[in-house]
Amino acid sequence: MDDKRVQFWVLYLTRFAEGFGFITLITLLPYYINSLDPSSTTVLGITISTGLIIGLYTTGFTLAQTVAVVPLAWAGDRFDKRLVLLIVLGVGVGVYALFPVVDSSASFIAIRALQGIAVTGTGLMTLSLVGQIADVGTRANYIGKANAASFGASILGSISAGTLYDAFGFGPIFLVIVCIMVVAWVGTFWFLNPDETRIEGFPFSGLALNRRILTLSTFRFQYAFAVTLVRTWVPIFAGVSAAEGGLAYGGFAVALTVVAEKFTNMCCQPFTGRLSDGYGRALFVFAGGAAYGLIALVVPLSPWLGGVLGFPAELVVTVPGVLAGSTLPAWLPYDSITDQLVLIGEVSPAFFPLVFLSGLLGIADSFREPASMALFADEGTEEGGVASSFGIRELVWRPGSVIAPLLGGWLMVEVSMASVFYVGGAFALTGVTTFLVILVRFHGRSALLEW
C-alpha cells in the first residue's frame, strides 16, 4: 500500500471520529432539552426566554467554532497541520470525557463550546490535508470519500447514541466516543506524515477578495441558515413532546431520522464528487442547494403524508420459533425474546415519510458538498493557503450556524415547529437564486458548467 493511500485512510479515520462525536450530540439534543428542562431566566436584568436557551444549546457550539476558525486555519498554514490536528484531537478527548458531568443548561452550553473548537480544528485540518495531498483533478472525489467516512460515523453514532441512551442513559455513550478519539489520535501520530508546507503572512487577506470565493460565498452565507435549521430541527421535531410541536418518538426512532440523511449522503458523495470533477462543480452546487430547499419545505407535512398514505404506527416482525422465549443477559433491558419483535414502536404514521424525506435531504446535499469543498480547495491551493481557504469557507458559514439556532428556537416556541422548516427552505432557495444571478452576471452563462 503506497504512502499517500495510507495517509488518506488515516485522515478518513479522523473524519470518522469527528463525525461520530458531532452527530451523537445532535441525536441526544432533544433528550438534553427534556432532561435539563430549560426555562426562561434573567441575567444582568435581561430576560432570556426558554426558546433562546434552547437555541444556545447549539449556538454555544457554533459561536465557539466562529471564534476558533481564523486562529486554527492560520496555524495550519503557518505551522505543521499534522501537529495542529494532534492538538485538537487531544482537546476532543478531554471534552467528550466532560459531558457526563453536565447538570445544568449553563454547563452543557459551556462544554458544547469546547466541543465546537475541537470539531472545527479537526475538520479544517483533515480537509486541508486531503485537499493538499490529492491531485487537482481528483480533489472532489477524495473529499467526497472523506465526507463519506464522516457520514458513516454519523450513522453509527446516531444508532448507538439512541440505543445506548434508551438502555443506559448518557454515560456509556461518551466512553465510546473517547475511545474512538484516542484511536484516531494514535493513528494520526503514527501514520500521517508531517506537513512541511509553511505559508508566511496572513493568507486570509488575499483569498477574501478572490472572485470565485466571493461568488460562492453569496450562496453559502444563506445556505448556512437553511442547513443549520433543517439538520438541527429534524431530530428535535421527531423527539420533543407533542406539546412543543414534536412527534415524541423514542431514541432509536429519532436516531433513524438522522441516520437516513447521513446514509444517503455517505453512499452518494464519492459518486457525486467524481461526477462534479468531470461535469462542473458550480452546477452541482446550484442543483443540490435548490433540491435541499424544496425538500425542506415538505418536512412539516410528514404527519399529513403518513395519514394519507396509510403508514403504520409501528414496525413488527415475527421471531422464529427456535428463538422465541430465549433468555437474555441480565444487563439488557428485556428478560427474554418474545414471539413478536417490535423494531420501531410507539411512533405515528408520520415516521416513515419523515425518514424518507430526511434521506432525500442527504441525496440533495451530496451533490453540493464535495463540489463546494473542491472549489475552495482549488482556490486555496493555487494561492498558497489551503487551510485559510477552508477557514474562509467556515467563516462564511458561521453567521448562519450561530444565528439560525436562536431563530429556530424562537420560531419553535413563538410561532410553530413547521415555521422552522419553511424558513430553512426559503433560505436555501434564495441562496441558489442569488448564486445563479451573480454567476451569470459576472462570470458568464458558461460558468455554471465550466467551474
Which residues make up each language-model segment?
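Cytoplasmic helix-loop-helix junction between adjacent transmembrane helices
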Residues: I111-G152
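Helix-loop-helix hairpin linking two adjacent transmembrane segments in secondary transporters
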Residues: A146-W190
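Structural signature of the two symmetry-related core transmembrane helices
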Residues: L83-L98, V178, L283-V298
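Conserved MFS/SLC helix-loop-helix module at the cytosolic interface between two early adjacent transmembrane helices
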Residues: V67-D103, S276
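Short amphipathic helix-loop junctions that connect adjacent transmembrane helices
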Residues: T27-G51, T232-F252
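Helix-breaking motifs and short loop linkers at transmembrane-helix boundaries and internal kinks
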Residues: D80, V101-S107, A118, G280, ...
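C-terminal membrane-cytosol helix-exit motif in multi-pass small-molecule transporters
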Residues: C179-T197, G431-L439
